[in-house]
Amino acid sequence: MPALGWAVAAILMLQTAMAEPSPGTLPRKAGVFSDLSNQELKAVHSFLWSKKELRLQPSSTTTMAKNTVFLIEMLLPKKYHVLRFLDKGERHPVREARAVIFFGDQEHPNVTEFAVGPLPGPCYMRALSPRPGYQSSWASRPISTAEYALLYHTLQEATKPLHQFFLNTTGFSFQDCHDRCLAFTDVAPRGVASGQRRSWLIIQRYVEGYFLHPTGLELLVDHGSTDAGHWAVEQVWYNGKFYGSPEELARKYADGEVDVVVLEDPLPGGKGHDSTEEPPLFSSHKPRGDFPSPIHVSGPRLVQPHGPRFRLEGNAVLYGGWSFAFRLRSSSGLQVLNVHFGGERIAYEVSVQEAVALYGGHTPAGMQTKYLDVGWGLGSVTHELAPGIDCPETATFLDTFHYYDADDPVHYPRALCLFEMPTGVPLRRHFNSNFKGGFNFYAGLKGQVLVLRTTSTVYNYDYIWDFIFYPNGVMEAKMHATGYVHATFYTPEGLRHGTRLHTHLIGNIHTHLVHYRVDLDVAGTKNSFQTLQMKLENITNPWSPRHRVVQPTLEQTQYSWERQAAFRFKRKLPKYLLFTSPQENPWGHKRTYRLQIHSMADQVLPPGWQEEQAITWARYPLAVTKYRESELCSSSIYHQNDPWHPPVVFEQFLHNNENIENEDLVAWVTVGFLHIPHSEDIPNTATPGNSVGFLLRPFNFFPEDPSLASRDTVIVWPRDNGPNYVQRWIPEDRDCSMPPPFSYNGTYRPV
């Protein structure tokens, strides 16, 4: 790395000089968490390019032997400084960017990160390290568009001997293919040891849903050199057998020694051919078949007669009792920050850390696949949301900018949406019967929630990320999985690792795991962790001493140390996970928020097993740690391609076994599910049953249900004469788009 002569003292002086006076409005204060604007991204880009000693080249240059800026995103200031700015009115923390540079044009290629600031007019940079003494290896870098282009060229050249083989067995080719081209899916980790960059590629026919069209051929390519001329195919797998090279496969094919599978033509009418005589591809989304009760009209949709009931200013949201900021981090995804309810902070940060999918299979690519999606730009693949499908048409859509494997900021329109919606179930209700065929009163509060949503399409899979805010102080984080399954070529042996989904297709067994960081600040930063469980007691009946009573009692456990509060998957996780404040509610209970996890996850890899080092967080459905600035993330963009020597090892967060009583606490939550693909996953996995997440629920935090402040409540009182009295606090709408006027009878009588 070229020598950089910026002094630390000069940086500190600049940080102090650029600090701003305390802002007075919420939107301006929320800006401390906001993603970099298009102008800020360009300013960082220009500043880095002005440093001639970096010898930067465009990302689009088709070579690995270059220095290029791969990623620019906002670098979150230290929590201590942010809280003093938010709560004490002190100076605005200096605004900085994180820049990741691939240094391939030097004797020892590496990846180096820098903090660049102050923004909006940067004038310094300093090196960053994921942990002291760690240097990200060249092989650990995420794959780039330029590398993909070189890989495709390598495949074209290496598979020339297989041209006739491809035409005869698939009808597609890498050579002069026009609308009948072959494509590939690369899997990771890329090798079997740190420092390797050897990828198995699944060769597929490039048609709609090509993920489901493997040809039976998989290739192992070594692409570790910065000189793509040295890249080579090391092994070949075809229909259950290994070959040493494409030439060997071509030779044995010509000699009739290969067990060939000739695939049916997926495009009998040609690409794009729209014929009513030909059924659509099984991987297509085109409708086919009929319901017993056909539906030929559009369904219900939301309306907002008076516009949105939330306020959105910049990256700040206000909704009923809620206020929070948000950002869409290019590397790892959606974060909500500075979350308040009723004017009190509940959480400083709730964020997605990583999403993994760990597979099994009979083919080499199937058994090698362990996807760690932050290594594929989990937060940057946030493509446009469709109104009326991905979000209600009433949603407010938000654009974002990402600088990820590009030469300029890339504009992603409608990457996020924010909307209020009815849940379809009351938040609460009660029918108070008079047990005489009538009622004393009916009271109900309609279920309404605010949803902040984005999606990540990581190649074949689509993740839908939601943060949901309820009017009673409950916050929910949820992930829905959909998209195409990761599939390999059918062999009879493959049925041990998945399900046959089509003639030549196996849907491979896999487990989805998602890791969240939940920095709870329950009425302050001094919190403790405890659990409540139900325990049965068997006692003498006090009013009938000859009999006994079995009844539940409360069993409370206080956790003093991090190791005590790290729950392994094989250990029973208590149902009530409580983060308490020293403060008490009016009834003498600690003001508390409960973490409630909804997950079907289990441990997938044995502890200490090779690649498991990159996902040691996956040992724990819950681990509670003391806040440390050195423990802000549980994964990184480097874990995918070097899981054997990752920069962040979550297990090390627990080694110091710090005290967690009356401390600033962080909950690390793992959720997920086992997915055994089935025929109904064609063409795409559906969202019902494939969602996981957790809730943060007030537990003695308030003196009563805070949703009593909602004016959506409706109470109905019976009258002896005339219509019942309906008590409302928001006038009933008479808009043409609204449902019929509300009415309620409440009687139940014999007929």
Swiss-Prot record:
Ca(2+) 1 binds at D519, L520, D521, D664, L665. Inhibited by amiloride and amiloride analogs. Inhibited by isoniazid, cimetidine, clonidine, berenil and pentamidine. Binds 1 copper ion per subunit. PROSITE patterns: COPPER_AMINE_OXID_1, COPPER_AMINE_OXID_2. This is Diamine oxidase [copper-containing]. Glycans are attached at N110, N168, N538, N745. The gene is AOC1. It comes from the Eukaryota. Belongs to the copper/topaquinone oxidase family. SUPFAM superfamilies: Amine oxidase catalytic domain, Amine oxidase N-terminal region. It is found in: Secreted, Extracellular space; Cell membrane. The active site is at D373, Y461. Homodimer; disulfide-linked. GO terms for biological process: putrescine metabolic process. It is an enzyme of class 1 (oxidoreductase). N-glycosylated. Its cofactor is Cu(2+); Ca(2+); L-topaquinone. Its EC number is 1.4.3.22. GO terms for cellular component: bicellular tight junction; extracellular exosome; extracellular region; extracellular space; peroxisome; plasma membrane; specific granule lumen. PANTHER family: AMILORIDE-SENSITIVE AMINE OXIDASE [COPPER-CONTAINING], COPPER AMINE OXIDASE. It catalyses: histamine + O2 + H2O = imidazole-4-acetaldehyde + H2O2 + NH4(+); N(tau)-methylhistamine + O2 + H2O = 1-methylimidazole-4-acetaldehyde + H2O2 + NH4(+); putrescine + O2 + H2O = 4-aminobutanal + H2O2 + NH4(+); cadaverine + O2 + H2O = 5-aminopentanal + H2O2 + NH4(+). It is a peripheral membrane protein. Optimum pH is 7.2. Widely expressed with higher expression in placenta and kidney. Disulfide bonds join C177-C181, C391-C417.
